[in-house]
Amino acid sequence: MLTPPPDLKITRLPHNKSVEDMLAEGEVDALIHSDIIKPMEAGDPRVARLWPDYKAEEIRFYKKTQIFPIMHVMGIRQEIVDRHPWIPINLFHAFEKSKAIGMRRMENPRIVPLAWYLEAWNEQQEILGPDPWEYGLGDKNKHNMNTIAGYSHEQGLTKHRWTTDDLFTSTFQGRKRGDEWRI
């Protein structure tokens, strides 16, 4: 259970409201979201990005910190791993194989209906490398996770400064950047 620092106020989201609507209504000041939220899609003038040229800001941040935010983390209860130690690495390989199939498809410029898709794809690879959302605990993800864990500790969200070795099983070494997509 999280025990927040005394100066941090946590309020539960009402069941009858979305955080997107609350932002548009001015009930919350800011929102971090992985999707483009409905008020932005609708062109609601009450909602705007923090940085108008967000792409340039994200690129600047990446070049400065080498952090590209992790989208998801997979967790398996320790009791499951203890009983079935083959599960983590086999799940990892299954997800890697699935991703490899998808990424191979992305190399085809006709996979998405965008006129300049290939140019955007190549630009992303030039800046972020071949796989910005790599799986496993390679050097990039360890750097990301250790940095985030450090921020959590500095901001009083955790009492201990955790590392990836504390939080994750050692079976996930991951694919190295630049490796070919394998199927």
Please place each PLM-identified region on the residue numbering.
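Pocket-lining segment of extracytoplasmic ligand-binding domains
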Residues: 4-107
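Serine/threonine-rich low-complexity intrinsically disordered regions
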Residues: 18, 44, 55, 113-115, ...
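Alpha-helix boundary/capping detector
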Residues: 49, 117, 121, 177-179
